[in-house]
């Protein structure tokens, strides 16, 4: 589980500092591996070797979207669904994170 504390300025001009959570379970990683031609690692190696910005941008979005969720109040569940993802993607935090990953190799590698 990756917890990212991000400070953003929302669309109303209010500065907000909030925690955002990202996690891929072993099952989700396995599914990505098995449903990617040649495997996930080979695909990442191919994209980085070709320095394909288009494919890299698609990969960042896929990873963000598959890993974002919210913790249940009791901490037992990590909730990921279309509504949770749509809510996050409509924030400035999503925009800032995507931009940072797409434009900063070190940030992308750390994520």
Predicted stretch roles:
Residues 47, 67-68, 101:
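Generic structural signal for hydrophobic core residues of well-folded globular domains
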Residues 53, 58-78:
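Short, structured surface segments that line ligand/substrate-binding pockets
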Residues 5-10, 51-54, 84:
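Intrinsically disordered, low-complexity boundary segments flanking structured domains
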Residues 1-42:
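Short, charged/polar N-terminal "headpieces" of proteins
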Residues 28-62:
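Acidic, aromatic-enriched beta-alpha/helix-loop junctions
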Residues 12-14, 37, 58, 78-79, ...:
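Homeobox/homeodomain signature
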Residues 72-111:
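C-terminal charged interaction modules
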């Amino acid at each position: 589980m990756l917890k990212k504390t991000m400070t953003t300025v929302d669309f109303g001009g209010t500065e907000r500092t909030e925690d955002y959570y990202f996690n891929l379970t072993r099952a989700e990683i396995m599914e990505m591996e098995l449903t990617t031609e040649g495997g996930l690692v080979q695909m990442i190696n191919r994209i980085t070797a070709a320095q394909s910005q288009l494919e890299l941008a698609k990969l960042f979005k896929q990873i963000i979207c598959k890993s974002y969720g919210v913790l249940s109040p009791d901490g037992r569940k990590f909730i990921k669904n279309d509504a949770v993802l749509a809510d996050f993607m409509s924030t400035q935090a999503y925009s800032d994170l995507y931009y940072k990953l797409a434009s900063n190799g070190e940030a992308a590698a750390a994520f």
